[in-house]
Amino acid sequence: NCSAPLAYHKNRQMLLCHHCGHQLQPVPGLCPACGGKLLYSGFGTQRVEEELAAALPGARILRMDQDSTMQKNAHERMFTRFARQEYDILLGTQMVAKGLDFEKVTLVGVLGIDSMLFGQGFRSYENTFSLITQVVGRGGRAELPGRALIQTAVPEHPVLQLAAGQDYEAFYQEEIAFRKLCLYPPYCAFCVVGFSGSQDGAVFAAAHRFGSILAEQAARQPRLPLRVLGPTPMNIAMLNGKYRYKLTLKCRNDAAFRALMRQTLEEYGEQKLPARASVAIDFNSDGDM
């Protein structure tokens, strides 16, 4: 149903799509579509827990993820037990890095930071810097000294170096210069027009037609700042059986621009296209929907 890979949940012995909820249980030995062998890539919290248990046999490990926190108030109970020192290691996703204060935590580690550093979206550097800054602040919060270990293939990367040094001012100066050069927020606004439907070609044609109408409307207002990129597939090109494309607009999100989009949408709706595609507009987007 989706173009995103399925996530393997070992304790439930199932493959699950975290976008549409589709699941395969039990896990098939071969791909049901092509008959090939299934390959497992990357690592999740369950895989990391296994590696930790093998490396540190006596360690008491508390894992926090979607599977282990499904019950009501599970997060609070786990944090309380860890604070009482019933466990030696707290393993989880980004939730364990934010706003927590355990006075005897002296070592914090981040695995696979490169997936965030080189991830999609213009805020990837900002998000990476923010996460590392939070992580560095988790350890050694009382009298005991703390350390933070960051796993990366590019330790010399400026963002990682600045984050490790907690140099917010230098990071800000580099990031704001980069965004100005690329015309990213705050020097413009991102507006994304998304299209979805059951026929790939029809959805692409609808996105292309909307872009043509927008160009015609914008030509009547030459002083209105606007750049149109696309149509291109969304980051998840198919979601729940629907093909998805987008137009990315660099604009100034003011009354004149919103009036332009309203006119374009009205004219697009009046045209009789062979196959309709649903349209959604995000006026304050990060670049995808």
Annotate each PLM feature.
Residues Y168-E169, F204-L229:
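Short amphipathic alpha-helix segments
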Residues A218-P225, M238-Y243, Y268:
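Nucleotide-binding motor/catalytic cores of P-loop/tubulin-like NTPases across gene-expression machines
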Residues R262, E266-M289:
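Generic C-terminus detector
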